[in-house]
Amino acid sequence: MAIGEKITISVIKADIGGWPGHSRVHPQLIEAAEEVLAKAKEEGTIIDFYVAYAGDDLQLIMTHKKGVDSPDIHGLAWKAFEEATEIAKEFGLYGAGQDLLKDAFSGNIRGMGPGIAEMEITLRKSEPIVTFHMDKTEPGAFNLPIFRMFADPFNTAGLVIDPNMHMGFRFEVWDIKEHKRVILNTPEEIYDLLALIGAKSRYVIKRVYPKEGHKISKDEPVAVISTEKLYEIAGEYVGKDDPVAIVRAQSGLPALGEVLEPFAFPHLVSGWMRGSHNGPIMPVPMHQANPTRFDGPPRVVALGWQISPEGKLVGPVDLFDDPAFDYARQKALEITEYIRRHGPFEPHRLPLEDMEYTTLPGVLKKLEERFEDIE
Protein backbone atom coordinates (compact mmCIF):
# COMPACT_ATOMS: atom_id res chain seq x y z
CA MET A 1 0.00 0.00 0.00
CA ALA A 2 1.03 3.66 -0.24
CA ILE A 3 0.24 7.22 0.76
CA GLY A 4 -3.27 8.16 -0.36
CA GLU A 5 -4.62 4.62 0.04
CA LYS A 6 -7.22 3.56 2.61
CA ILE A 7 -6.10 1.86 5.80
CA THR A 8 -8.04 0.82 8.89
CA ILE A 9 -6.84 1.17 12.47
CA SER A 10 -8.63 -1.02 15.00
CA VAL A 11 -8.26 -0.92 18.78
CA ILE A 12 -10.21 -3.71 20.47
CA LYS A 13 -9.99 -4.38 24.22
CA ALA A 14 -11.43 -6.77 26.76
CA ASP A 15 -11.05 -7.64 30.42
CA ILE A 16 -10.48 -11.37 30.36
CA GLY A 17 -8.84 -11.84 33.76
CA GLY A 18 -7.05 -9.70 36.33
CA TRP A 19 -3.78 -10.45 38.13
CA PRO A 20 -4.49 -10.15 41.02
CA GLY A 21 -8.05 -8.91 41.37
CA HIS A 22 -8.71 -6.10 38.90
CA SER A 23 -5.21 -4.63 38.89
CA ARG A 24 -3.35 -5.73 35.74
CA VAL A 25 -2.94 -8.24 32.89
CA HIS A 26 -0.74 -11.31 33.34
CA PRO A 27 2.19 -11.36 30.84
CA GLN A 28 1.21 -14.79 29.51
CA LEU A 29 -2.17 -13.43 28.40
CA ILE A 30 -0.33 -10.82 26.36
CA GLU A 31 1.88 -13.54 24.87
CA ALA A 32 -1.15 -15.67 23.95
CA ALA A 33 -2.76 -12.75 22.11
CA GLU A 34 0.53 -11.93 20.37
CA GLU A 35 0.77 -15.48 19.02
CA VAL A 36 -2.72 -15.29 17.50
CA LEU A 37 -2.08 -11.89 15.91
CA ALA A 38 1.41 -12.84 14.68
CA LYS A 39 -0.08 -15.77 12.78
CA ALA A 40 -2.75 -13.49 11.29
CA LYS A 41 -0.03 -11.08 10.19
CA GLU A 42 1.87 -13.90 8.47
CA GLU A 43 -1.32 -14.94 6.69
CA GLY A 44 -1.97 -11.36 5.53
CA THR A 45 -5.18 -10.80 7.51
CA ILE A 46 -3.62 -7.78 9.22
CA ILE A 47 -0.70 -5.55 8.26
CA ASP A 48 0.68 -4.97 11.75
CA PHE A 49 -0.27 -5.21 15.42
CA TYR A 50 0.72 -4.44 18.98
CA VAL A 51 -0.64 -5.90 22.22
CA ALA A 52 -0.80 -3.53 25.18
CA TYR A 53 -2.58 -3.38 28.51
CA ALA A 54 -4.21 -0.84 30.79
CA GLY A 55 -5.11 -2.15 34.21
CA ASP A 56 -6.81 -5.52 33.74
CA ASP A 57 -7.74 -4.85 30.09
CA LEU A 58 -5.96 -6.58 27.22
CA GLN A 59 -5.60 -4.14 24.31
CA LEU A 60 -5.23 -5.19 20.66
CA ILE A 61 -4.00 -2.50 18.25
CA MET A 62 -4.11 -3.50 14.57
CA THR A 63 -3.73 -2.05 11.09
CA HIS A 64 -5.36 -3.70 8.07
CA LYS A 65 -7.18 -3.13 4.77
CA LYS A 66 -10.54 -4.67 5.64
CA GLY A 67 -12.47 -1.59 6.81
CA VAL A 68 -14.41 -1.09 10.02
CA ASP A 69 -16.66 -3.82 11.43
CA SER A 70 -14.84 -6.50 9.43
CA PRO A 71 -15.90 -10.03 10.46
CA ASP A 72 -12.33 -11.18 9.79
CA ILE A 73 -10.81 -8.62 12.17
CA HIS A 74 -13.47 -8.93 14.84
CA GLY A 75 -13.25 -12.71 14.65
CA LEU A 76 -9.48 -12.49 14.99
CA ALA A 77 -9.80 -10.33 18.11
CA TRP A 78 -12.36 -12.73 19.56
CA LYS A 79 -10.01 -15.65 18.95
CA ALA A 80 -7.14 -13.80 20.65
CA PHE A 81 -9.34 -13.08 23.66
CA GLU A 82 -10.53 -16.69 23.79
CA GLU A 83 -6.97 -18.04 23.70
CA ALA A 84 -5.93 -15.66 26.47
CA THR A 85 -9.05 -16.54 28.47
CA GLU A 86 -8.04 -20.21 28.49
CA ILE A 87 -4.79 -19.25 30.20
CA ALA A 88 -6.67 -16.94 32.57
CA LYS A 89 -8.91 -19.84 33.57
CA GLU A 90 -5.92 -22.16 33.95
CA PHE A 91 -4.27 -19.66 36.30
CA GLY A 92 -7.53 -18.93 38.12
CA LEU A 93 -7.24 -15.22 37.30
CA TYR A 94 -9.98 -13.01 38.64
CA GLY A 95 -12.93 -12.48 36.30
CA ALA A 96 -11.51 -14.79 33.63
CA GLY A 97 -13.32 -14.04 30.38
CA GLN A 98 -15.68 -11.56 32.07
CA ASP A 99 -15.98 -9.23 29.05
CA LEU A 100 -16.77 -12.08 26.65
CA LEU A 101 -20.51 -11.91 27.19
CA LYS A 102 -21.53 -14.31 24.41
CA ASP A 103 -20.54 -17.93 23.96
CA ALA A 104 -19.67 -17.81 20.26
CA PHE A 105 -18.59 -15.21 17.72
CA SER A 106 -21.33 -14.30 15.24
CA GLY A 107 -19.63 -12.02 12.71
CA ASN A 108 -19.38 -8.74 14.64
CA ILE A 109 -17.84 -8.23 18.06
CA ARG A 110 -20.05 -5.22 18.87
CA GLY A 111 -22.55 -6.07 21.58
CA MET A 112 -20.51 -9.09 22.68
CA GLY A 113 -18.57 -7.37 25.46
CA PRO A 114 -15.24 -6.05 24.15
CA GLY A 115 -14.77 -2.32 23.50
CA ILE A 116 -13.99 -1.19 19.96
CA ALA A 117 -12.62 1.97 18.37
CA GLU A 118 -11.96 1.77 14.62
CA MET A 119 -11.36 4.26 11.83
CA GLU A 120 -10.79 3.84 8.10
CA ILE A 121 -8.63 6.69 6.84
CA THR A 122 -6.79 7.88 3.77
CA LEU A 123 -3.11 7.64 4.67
CA ARG A 124 -1.41 11.04 4.76
CA LYS A 125 2.25 11.66 3.91
CA SER A 126 2.90 11.53 7.65
CA GLU A 127 0.22 9.92 9.83
CA PRO A 128 0.80 10.43 13.57
CA ILE A 129 -1.89 8.94 15.82
CA VAL A 130 -2.41 8.45 19.53
CA THR A 131 -4.30 5.51 20.99
CA PHE A 132 -5.75 6.16 24.44
CA HIS A 133 -6.53 3.34 26.84
CA MET A 134 -8.56 3.97 30.01
CA ASP A 135 -9.22 1.65 32.93
CA LYS A 136 -11.82 1.83 35.72
CA THR A 137 -14.11 4.30 33.97
CA GLU A 138 -16.77 4.74 31.28
CA PRO A 139 -16.89 6.09 27.68
CA GLY A 140 -18.04 9.54 28.84
CA ALA A 141 -14.63 10.00 30.46
CA PHE A 142 -13.38 11.01 27.01
CA ASN A 143 -15.96 13.80 26.57
CA LEU A 144 -13.99 16.56 28.25
CA PRO A 145 -10.55 15.80 26.74
CA ILE A 146 -11.88 15.22 23.21
CA PHE A 147 -13.86 18.46 23.42
CA ARG A 148 -10.77 20.33 24.55
CA MET A 149 -8.63 18.86 21.77
CA PHE A 150 -10.98 19.80 18.94
CA ALA A 151 -13.07 22.72 20.21
CA ASP A 152 -11.32 24.59 23.05
CA PRO A 153 -8.92 27.34 21.86
CA PHE A 154 -7.48 27.61 25.37
CA ASN A 155 -6.23 24.03 24.90
CA THR A 156 -5.63 23.92 21.15
CA ALA A 157 -3.93 27.05 19.84
CA GLY A 158 -4.32 25.75 16.29
CA LEU A 159 -8.04 26.55 16.40
CA VAL A 160 -7.02 30.21 16.51
CA ILE A 161 -3.79 30.38 14.52
CA ASP A 162 -3.85 27.47 12.04
CA PRO A 163 -5.89 28.40 8.93
CA ASN A 164 -6.50 24.67 8.30
CA MET A 165 -8.28 24.29 11.67
CA HIS A 166 -9.91 27.68 12.04
CA MET A 167 -13.26 26.51 10.63
CA GLY A 168 -13.65 24.02 13.49
CA PHE A 169 -14.85 20.43 13.55
CA ARG A 170 -18.01 18.30 13.61
CA PHE A 171 -18.84 16.17 16.65
CA GLU A 172 -20.92 12.98 16.43
CA VAL A 173 -22.63 12.56 19.80
CA TRP A 174 -24.47 9.41 20.86
CA ASP A 175 -27.34 9.17 23.31
CA ILE A 176 -26.36 5.75 24.63
CA LYS A 177 -29.65 5.25 26.50
CA GLU A 178 -32.02 6.07 23.63
CA HIS A 179 -29.59 4.76 20.98
CA LYS A 180 -29.73 7.93 18.89
CA ARG A 181 -27.05 10.24 17.52
CA VAL A 182 -26.67 13.85 16.47
CA ILE A 183 -23.89 15.76 14.67
CA LEU A 184 -23.05 19.22 15.99
CA ASN A 185 -20.77 21.81 14.42
CA THR A 186 -18.18 23.79 16.35
CA PRO A 187 -17.64 26.57 17.10
CA GLU A 188 -21.17 27.68 16.11
CA GLU A 189 -23.02 25.00 18.15
CA ILE A 190 -20.52 24.79 20.98
CA TYR A 191 -23.05 25.57 23.72
CA ASP A 192 -25.48 22.93 22.45
CA LEU A 193 -22.63 20.44 22.35
CA LEU A 194 -21.64 21.21 25.94
CA ALA A 195 -25.26 20.95 27.09
CA LEU A 196 -25.20 17.33 25.94
CA ILE A 197 -21.71 16.05 26.65
CA GLY A 198 -21.64 17.54 30.14
CA ALA A 199 -24.06 14.70 30.96
CA LYS A 200 -21.27 12.21 30.34
CA SER A 201 -23.05 9.07 31.53
CA ARG A 202 -25.66 9.45 28.78
CA TYR A 203 -24.29 11.60 25.94
CA VAL A 204 -20.88 10.57 24.65
CA ILE A 205 -18.69 11.79 21.83
CA LYS A 206 -18.38 8.91 19.36
CA ARG A 207 -16.46 10.55 16.50
CA VAL A 208 -14.99 13.86 15.41
CA TYR A 209 -14.94 14.83 11.72
CA PRO A 210 -13.43 17.73 9.75
CA LYS A 211 -15.70 20.26 8.09
CA GLU A 212 -16.24 20.90 4.39
CA GLY A 213 -13.13 22.55 2.97
CA HIS A 214 -10.64 20.78 5.24
CA LYS A 215 -7.73 18.98 3.56
CA ILE A 216 -9.12 15.74 5.05
CA SER A 217 -12.49 14.53 3.71
CA LYS A 218 -15.42 15.60 5.88
CA ASP A 219 -16.60 11.97 6.00
CA GLU A 220 -13.30 10.66 7.38
CA PRO A 221 -13.03 10.57 11.19
CA VAL A 222 -10.13 12.23 12.96
CA ALA A 223 -11.06 10.81 16.37
CA VAL A 224 -13.15 7.83 17.45
CA ILE A 225 -14.09 6.52 20.90
CA SER A 226 -15.49 3.17 22.04
CA THR A 227 -19.01 3.52 23.44
CA GLU A 228 -19.94 0.00 24.51
CA LYS A 229 -21.83 -0.16 27.82
CA LEU A 230 -21.30 -3.56 29.43
CA TYR A 231 -24.32 -3.40 31.71
CA GLU A 232 -26.61 -2.83 28.73
CA ILE A 233 -25.26 -5.99 27.13
CA ALA A 234 -25.10 -8.23 30.18
CA GLY A 235 -28.14 -6.91 32.06
CA GLU A 236 -26.10 -6.75 35.25
CA TYR A 237 -22.90 -5.16 36.49
CA VAL A 238 -19.92 -7.10 35.10
CA GLY A 239 -17.24 -4.42 35.20
CA LYS A 240 -16.79 -0.87 33.98
CA ASP A 241 -16.57 -0.20 30.26
CA ASP A 242 -12.91 0.94 30.23
CA PRO A 243 -13.01 2.85 26.93
CA VAL A 244 -10.39 3.28 24.22
CA ALA A 245 -9.91 6.01 21.62
CA ILE A 246 -7.92 6.77 18.47
CA VAL A 247 -6.94 10.37 17.69
CA ARG A 248 -5.12 11.62 14.58
CA ALA A 249 -2.70 14.53 15.00
CA GLN A 250 -0.83 17.31 13.14
CA SER A 251 -1.22 18.94 9.71
CA GLY A 252 -4.65 20.57 10.04
CA LEU A 253 -5.45 18.63 13.21
CA PRO A 254 -4.42 19.24 16.83
CA ALA A 255 -0.66 18.91 17.29
CA LEU A 256 0.56 16.03 19.42
CA GLY A 257 1.00 18.33 22.40
CA GLU A 258 -2.54 19.67 21.94
CA VAL A 259 -3.87 16.10 21.89
CA LEU A 260 -2.14 15.35 25.21
CA GLU A 261 -2.71 18.71 26.93
CA PRO A 262 -6.25 17.95 28.25
CA PHE A 263 -4.83 15.19 30.44
CA ALA A 264 -2.67 17.68 32.34
CA PHE A 265 -5.90 18.22 34.29
CA PRO A 266 -7.05 15.04 36.11
CA HIS A 267 -10.79 15.60 35.63
CA LEU A 268 -13.39 13.61 37.55
CA VAL A 269 -14.77 10.48 35.91
CA SER A 270 -17.22 7.76 36.91
CA GLY A 271 -16.17 4.19 37.64
CA TRP A 272 -13.38 3.32 40.07
CA MET A 273 -14.28 0.82 42.80
CA ARG A 274 -17.13 -1.49 41.72
CA GLY A 275 -17.93 0.98 38.94
CA SER A 276 -19.81 3.05 41.48
CA HIS A 277 -17.59 6.01 42.38
CA ASN A 278 -16.34 9.32 41.01
CA GLY A 279 -12.62 10.01 41.00
CA PRO A 280 -9.80 11.64 39.04
CA ILE A 281 -8.39 10.16 35.83
CA MET A 282 -4.62 9.85 36.25
CA PRO A 283 -2.35 9.94 33.16
CA VAL A 284 0.32 7.26 33.54
CA PRO A 285 2.87 5.29 31.50
CA MET A 286 1.74 1.77 30.71
CA HIS A 287 3.92 0.16 33.39
CA GLN A 288 2.07 2.25 36.00
CA ALA A 289 -1.41 1.43 34.70
CA ASN A 290 -2.06 -0.94 37.60
CA PRO A 291 -4.97 0.45 39.65
CA THR A 292 -4.50 -0.50 43.30
CA ARG A 293 -5.80 2.12 45.72
CA PHE A 294 -9.53 1.41 46.05
CA ASP A 295 -9.01 -0.27 42.66
CA GLY A 296 -7.82 3.05 41.30
CA PRO A 297 -7.66 5.88 40.83
CA PRO A 298 -8.83 5.49 37.21
CA ARG A 299 -5.94 5.48 34.72
CA VAL A 300 -5.33 6.61 31.15
CA VAL A 301 -2.42 5.48 28.95
CA ALA A 302 -1.44 7.29 25.73
CA LEU A 303 0.54 5.39 23.10
CA GLY A 304 1.98 7.37 20.20
CA TRP A 305 2.45 5.94 16.70
CA GLN A 306 3.46 6.85 13.19
CA ILE A 307 1.70 4.81 10.50
CA SER A 308 4.26 4.05 7.80
CA PRO A 309 3.39 4.22 4.06
CA GLU A 310 3.16 0.40 4.20
CA GLY A 311 0.69 0.55 7.09
CA LYS A 312 3.17 -0.53 9.75
CA LEU A 313 2.79 0.65 13.35
CA VAL A 314 5.98 2.58 14.13
CA GLY A 315 5.98 2.67 17.92
CA PRO A 316 4.69 2.78 20.51
CA VAL A 317 5.98 5.82 22.34
CA ASP A 318 4.65 5.81 25.91
CA LEU A 319 3.62 9.46 25.89
CA PHE A 320 2.69 9.91 29.55
CA ASP A 321 6.09 8.53 30.60
CA ASP A 322 7.22 12.12 31.01
CA PRO A 323 7.85 14.32 34.07
CA ALA A 324 5.67 16.97 32.40
CA PHE A 325 2.71 14.95 33.70
CA ASP A 326 4.06 14.55 37.25
CA TYR A 327 1.98 17.50 38.44
CA ALA A 328 -1.20 15.96 36.99
CA ARG A 329 -0.40 12.70 38.76
CA GLN A 330 0.26 14.49 42.04
CA LYS A 331 -2.97 16.46 41.71
CA ALA A 332 -4.86 13.22 40.96
CA LEU A 333 -3.49 11.71 44.17
CA GLU A 334 -4.54 14.78 46.16
CA ILE A 335 -8.05 14.55 44.71
CA THR A 336 -8.06 10.83 45.47
CA GLU A 337 -7.17 11.44 49.11
CA TYR A 338 -9.84 14.13 49.46
CA ILE A 339 -12.72 12.35 47.76
CA ARG A 340 -12.03 8.97 49.42
CA ARG A 341 -12.78 10.57 52.79
CA HIS A 342 -16.44 10.76 51.71
CA GLY A 343 -16.72 6.97 51.97
CA PRO A 344 -20.17 5.78 50.81
CA PHE A 345 -21.57 9.31 50.44
CA GLU A 346 -22.22 11.21 47.24
CA PRO A 347 -20.57 12.86 45.35
CA HIS A 348 -17.86 10.18 45.76
CA ARG A 349 -20.46 7.46 45.31
CA LEU A 350 -22.46 7.75 42.10
CA PRO A 351 -26.04 9.09 42.23
CA LEU A 352 -28.92 6.65 42.64
CA GLU A 353 -29.80 6.44 38.95
CA ASP A 354 -26.31 5.12 38.21
CA MET A 355 -26.46 2.48 40.96
CA GLU A 356 -29.02 0.26 39.23
CA TYR A 357 -26.73 -2.75 38.94
CA THR A 358 -25.50 -2.79 42.55
CA THR A 359 -27.05 -4.05 45.79
CA LEU A 360 -28.97 -0.79 46.25
CA PRO A 361 -32.19 -1.91 44.49
CA GLY A 362 -32.19 -5.00 46.69
CA VAL A 363 -31.81 -2.89 49.82
CA LEU A 364 -34.73 -0.70 48.78
CA LYS A 365 -36.89 -3.73 48.07
CA LYS A 366 -36.04 -5.26 51.45
CA LEU A 367 -37.06 -2.07 53.25
CA GLU A 368 -40.08 -1.38 51.04
CA GLU A 369 -42.72 -2.41 53.60
CA ARG A 370 -41.02 -0.45 56.38
CA PHE A 371 -41.32 2.88 54.59
CA GLU A 372 -44.20 5.00 55.93
CA ASP A 373 -45.92 8.08 54.56
CA ILE A 374 -44.87 11.38 56.10
CA GLU A 375 -47.91 13.37 57.20
Swiss-Prot record:
Dihydroxyacetone phosphate binds at H22, K136, R274, D295. Mg(2+) 4 binds at D241. It catalyses: beta-D-fructose 1,6-bisphosphate = D-glyceraldehyde 3-phosphate + dihydroxyacetone phosphate; beta-D-fructose 1,6-bisphosphate + H2O = beta-D-fructose 6-phosphate + phosphate. Beta-D-fructose 1,6-bisphosphate binds at H22, Y94, G107, N108, K136, Q250, S251, R274, D295, Y357. Consists of a single catalytic domain, but remodels its active-site architecture via a large structural change to exhibit dual activities. It comes from Thermococcus onnurineus (strain NA1). The lineage of its organism: Archaea, Methanobacteriati, Methanobacteriota, Thermococci, Thermococcales. Mg(2+) 3 binds at K240, D241, D242. The keyword Plastid does not apply. This is Fructose-1,6-bisphosphate aldolase/phosphatase. Mg(2+) 1 binds at D15, H22, D56, Q98. The keyword Oxidoreductase does not apply.
